[in-house]
Amino acid sequence: MTHPDRANVNPGSPPLRETLSQLRLRELLLEVQDRIEQIVEGRDRLDGLIDAILAITSGLKLDATLRAIVHTAAELVDARYGALGVRGYDHRLVEFVYEGIDEETRHLIGSLPEGRGVLGALIEEPKPIRLDDISRHPASVGFPLHHPPMRTFLGVPVRIRDEVFGNLYLTEKADGQPFSDDDEVLVQALAAAAGIAVDNARLFEESRTREAWIEATRDIGTQMLAGADPAMVFRLIAEEALTLMAGAATLVAVPLDDEAPACEVDDLVIVEVAGEISPAVKQMTVAVSGTSIGGVFHDRTPRRFDRLDLAVDGPVEPGPALVLPLRAADTVAGVLVALRSADEQPFSDKQLDMMAAFADQAALAWRLATAQRQMREVEILTDRDRIARDLHDHVIQRLFAVGLTLQGAAPRARVPAVRESIYSSIDDLQEIIQEIRSAIFDLHAGPSRATGLRHRLDKVIDQLAIPALHTTVQYTGPLSVVDTVLANHAEAVLREAVSNAVRHANATSLAINVSVEDDVRVEVVDDGVGISGDITESGLRNLRQRADDAGGEFTVENMPTGGTLLRWSAPLR
């Protein structure tokens, strides 16, 4: 018997139950397809994250690592612009690595971000920030002129253990959509790997720098053990420090009187410079009171500065600086200054500690060289005294005996010519004895000869320099080895140079440096109007002749910044 309802169903149409089953199957297939697409997309993004992590951890150079982090982060989330801001010790941005902005636009924008606005919010509170419209954030301060428009934003801190190294900034997702939760998770994972990569790169650079520091210290020590003059130490310190820090310039300032106690030093003089700095800075004086350099010298404490209160000329504008005392036992030999250009980041704590240790080791080498020089001088003086005693006790006495014998024999000579020859020989013996006595006197006067030269030069300055002319004098090296002839030359050179500065240059300051190494050097720098050709040919001809007579060199030139630089040198005899 057929059911009445079933009899009314159209035999050609599918049953209702079958239709519903097909609909559910279609929905299930679509859901499965979506899930598969999500799985594939997730796998692709995970593969992209792994590739990004491998890319940023493959190198050990810090600059290259920072750029790799920015590039891979932008690629990972399809961001048009990316940047990494490095935080300094005072939470300011000290370095800003960017991608997506061409150099022409970068030049039009001007200075790099300093950490204001939304960037500053991430610096003050280092946690992820994701914005659909950056302009709507309460901390937003807008963009500078010529800056490309940016709307979507994703910022994530980069940490090295408990330290926030910097922040990773990404803007303008390529499809115009806002950054998603998945984007944030991926960038956070990348930032974690970036912290490890940066830490490894920093450790590698620190190890290389420490190796260079050890090598530089060894080089200085080797030079000192080889008998280098203490004046050479400061030149080595400046050159090695410049190489270590890869900075713009270095300089060394020491007391005007290296024998005065540190508490009695009022001024320091810059005796050595290296790098991109004007040679005119050499011999510049720096007051101990009221200056950064003087404060470090007085306190014997290494310090760093964002900008040094010292006007120095050079091709680059000086910026961050390290000021390091050259400490040796209970003395301070001077101050070492390392300068970076104004557009470079400040020095770090680790760099300060490392360079302070280098300065201490260098000062110890200077102390060793000074002690060796003093010991050599004592040995020389001891030998002089011994030779003088031998000459007096043996040679002169024997010559006297010979002379007395000849005096007794002369009257008995019958031939007049022989008698005259004997008397002539007696006179020669008297002259020889007198010359030996003079030599003995010079040998005994050896310790005071340096003092005599210094006294003679100081006397010249006192006689010729006028009160309105600010004059500084620096003596370096063993003046005790300068003989009388060279001392006379040095006095004449200084007299002529100071006289010209007073009479012709209209100078207000005069810097004098007298040094003794393998030769005697006299340098005189003034800030006057320069020297004309006629004065050079007439008034300075004598100095050129003195240099020729002594086998040395003489130059005089106008400096680009104004004033005159006079150099005279002659080899030691």
From Swiss-Prot:
Kindly give the Gene3D superfamilies that the UniProt entry links to this protein. Answer: 1.20.5.1930, 3.30.450.40, Histidine kinase-like ATPase, C-terminal domain
Key word Oxidoreductase present: no
Which keywords appear in this protein's UniProt record, sorted alphabetically? Cytoplasm, Heme, Iron, Kinase, Magnesium, Metal-binding, Phosphoprotein, Repeat, Transferase, Two-component regulatory system
Task: Report the induction information.
Answer: Expressed during aerobic growth, it is not further induced in hypoxia, or by nitric oxide (NO) or carbon monoxide (CO) treatment. Expression is not changed in a devR deletion mutant; i.e. it is not part of the dormancy regulon.
| EC numbers for this chain | 2.7.13.3
Q: What does this protein do?
A: Interacts with the two-component regulatory system DevR/DevS (DosR/DosS) involved in onset of the dormancy response. Required for full induction of the DevR (DosR) regulon; required during early adaptation to anaerobiosis, to start induction of the DevR regulon. May act as a direct hypoxia/oxygen sensor. O(2) acts as a switch, with the Fe(2+)-O(2)-bound protein inactive in autophosphorylation. Autophosphorylates under anaerobic but not aerobic conditions, binding of NO or CO has no effect on autophosphorylation. Binds a number of gases; O(2), NO, CO. May be a secondary sensor for CO.
Q: What is this protein called?
A: Oxygen sensor histidine kinase response regulator DosT
> What is the organism field in this record?
Mycobacterium tuberculosis (strain ATCC 25618 / H37Rv)
